[in-house]
Amino acid sequence: MFKAIVSADTLQETLDSVSVLVDECKIHLDDDTLSIRAVDPASVGMVDLDLAATAFESYEADGGLIGVNLSRLEDIAGMADAGQLIQLELDEETRKLHIQIDGLEYTLALIDPDSIRQEPDIPDLDLPAHVAIEGRDIDRAVTAADMVSDHIALGVDTGDDLFYVNAEGDTDDVHLELAPDQLIDLDAGDAHSLFSLDYLKDMNKAIPTTAEVELELGDEFPIKLHFDIADAQGHVTYMLAPRIQSN
Amino acid sequence: MFKAIVSADTLQETLDSVSVLVDECKIHLDDDTLSIRAVDPASVGMVDLDLAATAFESYEADGGLIGVNLSRLEDIAGMADAGQLIQLELDEETRKLHIQIDGLEYTLALIDPDSIRQEPDIPDLDLPAHVAIEGRDIDRAVTAADMVSDHIALGVDTGDDLFYVNAEGDTDDVHLELAPDQLIDLDAGDAHSLFSLDYLKDMNKAIPTTAEVELELGDEFPIKLHFDIADAQGHVTYMLAPRIQSN
Amino acid sequence: MFKAIVSADTLQETLDSVSVLVDECKIHLDDDTLSIRAVDPASVGMVDLDLAATAFESYEADGGLIGVNLSRLEDIAGMADAGQLIQLELDEETRKLHIQIDGLEYTLALIDPDSIRQEPDIPDLDLPAHVAIEGRDIDRAVTAADMVSDHIALGVDTGDDLFYVNAEGDTDDVHLELAPDQLIDLDAGDAHSLFSLDYLKDMNKAIPTTAEVELELGDEFPIKLHFDIADAQGHVTYMLAPRIQSN
């Protein structure tokens, strides 16, 4: 059983966070939380999303699992105006999701969850460096790095106590250093890893410029990015595997 | 003889209503009205437009007929700012239309009216159901239906006293029901017809979201859509032939 | 030695004025002025730009010459917000330009000036007609002319004391006449020349609609267009060679 009412903004934010990595996903409909875990086809980027029942206008669920086509669901949500409410109701028998927006009813055929790529186990890493940074600074770094290279190094300099971004191209380079007073928080630790810019650009699309983003970093380790959605009633974690550094 | 001054907005609205169906048209320049009738190449959609002399800043005509390339005339009108006035003057000898916008003069070669597809006779049908609906509700229905199908059913349910829209796709469906309190007016009568979404999408482009649109519907009959333009100094009627239903 | 701080707006305006004609250019870094002269590959359009040291927040230079890729430098400047300051510093040894925007450092490899097309000598012509006109009127004339033709005639009618623009297409024509009261200034003299619209469209892109543009015109002679940038701390001159008229 699943029946919920949610604002168009919240639904769009939720779907966008996942659709930057995958086209289809499984959605867990537990009694107090809607949750999604997914990994991209190359197993390089992962997403773990939780949206509390309190993020909804109303929410009733009892532990179901549905498979959805994300871009289709995004298109439907995109028909609603910003403040409008969207009603969702699962028909268990037909395995269809009834979506209502101000009298307009869309009947969406669901996907068999077994046909969707398996959900990843997102490892509980104990990474030495923690950085809290504004979404707009991630956007600036990723946009600039993309002008010169297809990969980007993120690290923490424990000596000078700063977070840095480096991108080295064939002729041009991009470098950004942020000291503690330019960050929301810095818990320095030895960290330097290289990442594919394609993935970070996709993740960056889903990060609001005003969001406070927590980064967890290590030395040639995956990076984790955490941020809130839906007025902190929802939470997204991205994990991105490092690229092997050639020196 | 034809000489007129009209606001850029009014001219654009007029041209757009016709250009969604045809590339070229004949314009009748009668002494108190400018009028256009046209049918698309497949004879599926028709338009009948009247613009009263009172919609113009000034208007002098004596029953002439000109043939124009609509997209060309739209491009010219598009050079004017929203509030600007456009002067039109026909040179009978050269068969050219002189168009002036704030000192800029564009000389447009006209098309021989005889070379343009014949104007349709728009039949005076006595259709059983009449619905008055906001332009934005037509827009919502057409946009949603377009996500699942290439045709759309419009009808009136006399039992439940409501207007409905149905679009059935291979996997997903769209359904919209509007009761009298969600409509401007409903004069129920037996009606259900299937239409090509391509045509309705084109017509929808020319219908302002704030317009009050009168629909006339029947059972496997053409639909007529009426709405005002130019502050009710002009009027547009679209007629769209039904598709044969396969059951 | 070169070290300067400049607003993003001023830098963008400067680069745009030159990039409409060429992809790479030499920049002269004199002690009180930054200047650029360039000619397009076909030697039809030329630009001569001066930006005074006073247009910068701070400026130190001693007569250097650098070669730059304009679109790359425009992309970098485009990362800054409208009001933001951009720091430029030349590393003489590595021949790289260090560009800083709010902590983000971009290291741009310069181009050997000797590998860039030679700078033109812009002739000091004594043209008989001078017209001062708003940028928006140039924009209107060029946009309209582009609808009918690929060349445009500009001239002054000394008899009627007006500046005119003519474009003749295969079927349609565009004509604009501006009398002294519709111009900022008119110093009439015999002038009529035909120009390639492609070049004038490119130059028009860099002319602000609110700019006061000085035109110098002659009879089958090049045209010169002058306008200020950077709150009159900078100045741009375009020169465009005429096309041969076929009569």
Curated annotation (Swiss-Prot), chains A, B, C:
InterPro entries xref list: DNA_clamp_sf, Pr_cel_nuc_antig, Pr_cel_nuc_antig_C, Pr_cel_nuc_antig_CS, Pr_cel_nuc_antig_N
Pfam families: PCNA_C, PCNA_N
Record-level Gene Ontology MF annotations: DNA binding; DNA polymerase processivity factor activity
The keyword DNA-binding belongs to this UniProt entry's keyword annotation: yes
Gene3D superfamilies: 3.70.10.10
Keywords on record: DNA replication, DNA-binding
SUPFAM superfamilies per the UniProt record, alphabetical: DNA clamp
Gene Ontology BP annotations: leading strand elongation; regulation of DNA replication
Subunit: Homotrimer. The subunits circularize to form a toroid; DNA passes through its center. Replication factor C (RFC) is required to load the toroid on the DNA.
Functional note: Sliding clamp subunit that acts as a moving platform for DNA processing. Responsible for tethering the catalytic subunit of DNA polymerase and other proteins to DNA during high-speed replication.
Annotated family: Belongs to the PCNA family.
Protein name (record): DNA polymerase sliding clamp
Organism of this sequence: Halobacterium salinarum (strain ATCC 700922 / JCM 11081 / NRC-1) (Halobacterium halobium)
